[in-house]
Amino acid sequence: MSLSNPSQILLRNSELLIAKAPLFINLPEDGFIDAYLEIHKPDSINCFNTNFIDYQAITKKYCSSSNNKSVQTTFASTYQTKTCHDLAIIAFPKSKAELNFTLAMIAHCINEETKILLVGEKKCGIQSAAKLTQNILSCCQKVDAARHCLLFVGLFQPERLSDVFNLQDWFKTYHITVEGIQLTIASLPGVFSQQKLDVGTALLLSNLPNNMAGEILDFGCGAGVISCFIGKKFSETNLSLLDVSALALTSAQESLALNGLSGNVFPSNSLSDVNEHYQHVVSNPPFHQGVKTHYQASEDFLAGINKKLNKQGNITIVANSFLRYQPIMEAHIGNTRVITKDKGFTVYRAQLA
């Protein structure tokens, strides 16, 4: 795998990467760790990822018994450790609010001398890094610009190192009413649909199958809006929620609790970790990865979901009308109907024969 542009700009500043116990936050598996180990010899490397795909890739490569290079991996919404890191490299997140969340999260495991490196492509908005972090970092300066990327380095403000991180402080809650059903939704920074109900999901909730019962799969659950609505409207359902994002999964779990519901909440790379069969599958399938448009995960989901449906089971999705999901559903599931169209979105339903 070729090095990404952010990884390349990091490696051309190798003097900034010297560390005994570096922490890599949300870096992809693109060969950077191998390149890092060729020029530096840390005691250990900790890789923290909120994206399940990146976590799986790094774990598979570096954490097998035959290829252990002292690389430790963590998939979670928050990072907990007793290690004091002397370097933290953070991939600039798609959500600017997520950056300060991430910095606050690591205050317990760094010190005044820990270098904080922020790296990302310009189109992600990293130009504003110094302004965004002015209340947390001191001397946050741009040190390189290349390959359409920027690299910033800074240090924690000493008084912020003692801040106690409380996950509950970072949830944003909002209240919505759909078909007379009141919901309270909680979402962490960076989670889709934070602070409001998006148009597509609203259209989906108004056009679900009648009398839903049995096992339900909410694919790409985000903050859990769809499952919370189904759970409160249809009491005979058992909810399963999956997402690739640890931040989304934690948000969904919180949303379920706030609405007096429970469910099986788990990570999956498309359908990689789906082991059950379902009577109903519902989704507002994601097609953005970071700031990039990415369709493959949703297309793989639609092509493979027939193997996870009960006989006579159905799938209902909402998508931007320009996305050609209907032919995929027709080919792999069966007859696919357009339930409704509105405001650039279309609701489709297919039933397994």
Go through each PLM region and give its residues:
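Short beta->alpha hinge that forms the Motif I/post-I loop of the SAM-binding pocket
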Residues: 50, 121, 243-248, 293, ...
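Short SAM/SAH-binding signature in class I
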Residues: 85-91, 278-286
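Conserved helix-to-beta-strand junction in the class I
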Residues: 105-110, 304-311
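C-terminal catalytic and target-recognition region of SAM-dependent MTase-like enzymes
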Residues: 308, 315-353
